[in-house]
Amino acid sequence: MSASASVGGPVPQPPPGPAAALPPGSAARALHVELPSQQRRLRHLRNIAARNIVNRNGHQLLDTYFTLHLCSTEKIYKEFYRSEVIKNSLNPTWRSLDFGIMPDRLDTSVSCFVVKIWGGKENIYQLLIEWKVCLDGLKYLGQQIHARNQNEIIFGLNDGYYGAPFEHKGYSNAQKTILLQVDQNCVRNSYDVFSLLRLHRAQCAIKQTQVTVQKIGKEIEEKLRLTSTSNELKKKSECLQLKILVLQNELERQKKALGREVALLHKQQIALQDKGSAFSAEHLKLQLQKESLNELRKECTAKRELFLKTNAQLTIRCRQLLSELSYIYPIDLNEHKDYFVCGVKLPNSEDFQAKDDGSIAVALGYTAHLVSMISFFLQVPLRYPIIHKGSRSTIKDNINDKLTEKEREFPLYPKGGEKLQFDYGVYLLNKNIAQLRYQHGLGTPDLRQTLPNLKNFMEHGLMVRCDRHHTSSAIPVPKRQSSIFGGADVGFSGGIPSPDKGHRKRASSENERLQYKTPPPSYNSALAQPVTTVPSMGETERKITSLSSSLDTSLDFSKENKKKGEDLVGSLNGGHANVHPSQEQGEALSGHRATVNGTLLPSEQAGSASVQLPGEFHPVSEAELCCTVEQAEEIIGLEATGFASGDQLEAFNCIPVDSAVAVECDEQVLGEFEEFSRRIYALNENVSSFRRPRRSSDK
């Protein structure tokens, strides 16, 4: 459905009247001046907008576009302009008209034309509004678009927006402004008739010239079409002549370049001969340098081996110190899931009670010393330094910038009303434990569990058992040539001085004597393990496999050791008495020279009866004659200081290990053997640091 209207019409001339002039020098300027003689043309049109479109298609919004048509009195011609489509709008404003896409011969001087607005959905459009517009009859609306009527079309011209006077549709009888106020300084004379005629003649001459140009252009094109064949042949001939000339010039240039290349070739041949002579001389130098490099490589290999040996010795020493540290400060767990350090209970940080202040201070002192020594051995500086003072140990916080220098030290013992400082000190200690765990790839989900975290770190991070009831993993004992390590250890030069003989302190009281007469649990368990334990079939196979490792096969035992081992096997198989040590036997053992920290030496072990279960027979072979690492270290330490003879380890064939060692090559066997040698050398260097002195000993 469309709305059709005719806007504009003949406008009557205004009656003559005086023109009121604005006062001189006034700054007021009229943006729009309605002149009676002003004419509006199609070329003055800038854009078109529609407002309040009535939609009768049932859609809330429409897609719209407009078309422009020229018209006469009886006929509307085909569209000469189509706008873009605006989606979903009943008040579209199309962009400015582009006269560049309009036909070239379009007469833009017309003032009457037809505007059709189309609307619809999904590419189905129908005519909504159709206006026949006379631009001279439009009404000025202002500098902005204002529309109040339905289906109203707004035309944007140079000086503002115009619309149809809806109060006088069809034919406008409204008179234009007859009173015009202008500045007198702006009044100028218009063109006279003769000037307009000159402009008209100039336009006609320009059009005539354009027609002449088009005519001459067509004539030229016709002549070119007729002479195109001959021109093509001439063009080809000239191109060939030009190519011949270019090729001749190129031939001359290539000849000159060839002469230069030949001369350069002779120079390069001479230079190449000189380089060949220099290369021969440098090759001789290289051979000499290779020989020197081989010597340096051998020296580097020797230094690298020395470095690896020293580094391995340092690592073994560190592991030994950590093992000793775990023996000094054992962490135990009872049946009530309570953790003890050196027999002193230490609950978690949130379970402290006031009645346990003394034991808590002692346990925290042990724990702080253990953490600080672990960090010292591992060469890992603690984030929060620990000041060890026994049960009055403290810890410092040098990180928090809100604390003064006097407030940075926190106690690790309950101290009156300073509960907050004590709790914070325990928190810093737990942070240090978490730091050590993080260094070894262990997380700390709960900081409050002080001893559980520390025990887990030592067992899983450092691979060290934290209680006294364990035996260390063992390594095979090589054949010993002398009781003193002056020149018997493999991988070390002779002449190493043995440490000075020292005397151990006597027990200061009878209680200490009784205390040190009792052997350590780890040594008793280690002594009883190969005798009283009846392994299952799987364990027996595993032990046999471990004893048959490459370390055992790489050792060269003397016939004398084998003979003593067979005698010891016979003595062990010959007796069947159970071992029941009494108090008197314990005192005798503590006073006997052949006991080491509560552990019988091989000479006494041979006289003891092995314990076997009834109904089962387990033959003791030569490979089962073994001792723990602790026993071997004690025996070697006493031999190094001169407290024992050099044949105590001869009866042992090996030291048991936890699992078999997979051997890929002889280098691995030699490396493991050198590791054992380094360990024995470290023990020989400083015997006193490997075992705590027993006060029950007289020496």
Swiss-Prot record:
<dbReference type="GO" id="GO:0036092">
    <property type="term" value="P:phosphatidylinositol-3-phosphate biosynthetic process"/>
</dbReference>
<comment type="function">
    <text>Versatile protein that is involved in regulation of different cellular pathways implicated in membrane trafficking. Involved in regulation of the COPI-dependent retrograde transport from Golgi and the endoplasmic reticulum by associating with the NRZ complex; the function is dependent on its binding to phosphatidylinositol 3-phosphate (PtdIns(3)P). During autophagy acts as a regulatory subunit of the alternative PI3K complex II (PI3KC3-C2) that mediates formation of phosphatidylinositol 3-phosphate and is believed to be involved in maturation of autophagosomes and endocytosis.</text>
</comment>
<feature type="region of interest" description="Sufficient for interaction with STX7; VTI1B AND STX8">
    <location>
        <begin position="200"/>
        <end position="269"/>
    </location>
</feature>
<keyword id="KW-0458">Lysosome</keyword>
<feature type="region of interest" description="Sufficient for interaction with VPS16, required for interaction with CEP63">
    <location>
        <begin position="270"/>
        <end position="442"/>
    </location>
</feature>
<feature type="modified residue" description="Phosphoserine; by MTOR">
    <location>
        <position position="498"/>
    </location>
</feature>
<feature type="modified residue" description="Phosphoserine">
    <location>
        <position position="550"/>
    </location>
</feature>
<keyword id="KW-0967">Endosome</keyword>
<feature type="coiled-coil region">
    <location>
        <begin position="224"/>
        <end position="305"/>
    </location>
</feature>
<feature type="modified residue" description="Phosphothreonine">
    <location>
        <position position="518"/>
    </location>
</feature>
<keyword id="KW-0227">DNA damage</keyword>
<dbReference type="GO" id="GO:0017124">
    <property type="term" value="F:SH3 domain binding"/>
</dbReference>
<dbReference type="GO" id="GO:0097352">
    <property type="term" value="P:autophagosome maturation"/>
</dbReference>
<feature type="modified residue" description="Phosphoserine">
    <location>
        <position position="549"/>
    </location>
</feature>
<dbReference type="GO" id="GO:0005764">
    <property type="term" value="C:lysosome"/>
</dbReference>
<dbReference type="GO" id="GO:0045335">
    <property type="term" value="C:phagocytic vesicle"/>
</dbReference>
<dbReference type="GO" id="GO:0007059">
    <property type="term" value="P:chromosome segregation"/>
</dbReference>
<dbReference type="GO" id="GO:0005813">
    <property type="term" value="C:centrosome"/>
</dbReference>
<dbReference type="Pfam" id="PF00168">
    <property type="entry name" value="C2"/>
</dbReference>
<feature type="modified residue" description="Phosphoserine">
    <location>
        <position position="582"/>
    </location>
</feature>
<dbReference type="GO" id="GO:0051684">
    <property type="term" value="P:maintenance of Golgi location"/>
</dbReference>
<feature type="modified residue" description="Phosphoserine">
    <location>
        <position position="493"/>
    </location>
</feature>
<dbReference type="GO" id="GO:0005737">
    <property type="term" value="C:cytoplasm"/>
</dbReference>
<dbReference type="InterPro" id="IPR018791">
    <property type="entry name" value="UV_resistance/autophagy_Atg14"/>
</dbReference>
<feature type="modified residue" description="Phosphoserine">
    <location>
        <position position="522"/>
    </location>
</feature>
<feature type="domain" description="C2">
    <location>
        <begin position="23"/>
        <end position="149"/>
    </location>
</feature>
<feature type="modified residue" description="Phosphoserine">
    <location>
        <position position="689"/>
    </location>
</feature>
<keyword id="KW-0597">Phosphoprotein</keyword>
<dbReference type="GO" id="GO:0071985">
    <property type="term" value="P:multivesicular body sorting pathway"/>
</dbReference>
<dbReference type="GO" id="GO:1901098">
    <property type="term" value="P:positive regulation of autophagosome maturation"/>
</dbReference>
<keyword id="KW-0256">Endoplasmic reticulum</keyword>
<keyword id="KW-0175">Coiled coil</keyword>
<dbReference type="GO" id="GO:0005769">
    <property type="term" value="C:early endosome"/>
</dbReference>
<keyword id="KW-0968">Cytoplasmic vesicle</keyword>
<dbReference type="GO" id="GO:0097680">
    <property type="term" value="P:double-strand break repair via classical nonhomologous end joining"/>
</dbReference>
<feature type="compositionally biased region" description="Low complexity">
    <location>
        <begin position="545"/>
        <end position="556"/>
    </location>
</feature>
<dbReference type="GO" id="GO:0005768">
    <property type="term" value="C:endosome"/>
</dbReference>
<feature type="region of interest" description="Disordered">
    <location>
        <begin position="1"/>
        <end position="24"/>
    </location>
</feature>
<dbReference type="GO" id="GO:0006281">
    <property type="term" value="P:DNA repair"/>
</dbReference>
<dbReference type="GO" id="GO:0000775">
    <property type="term" value="C:chromosome, centromeric region"/>
</dbReference>
<dbReference type="GO" id="GO:0005783">
    <property type="term" value="C:endoplasmic reticulum"/>
</dbReference>
<dbReference type="InterPro" id="IPR000008">
    <property type="entry name" value="C2_dom"/>
</dbReference>
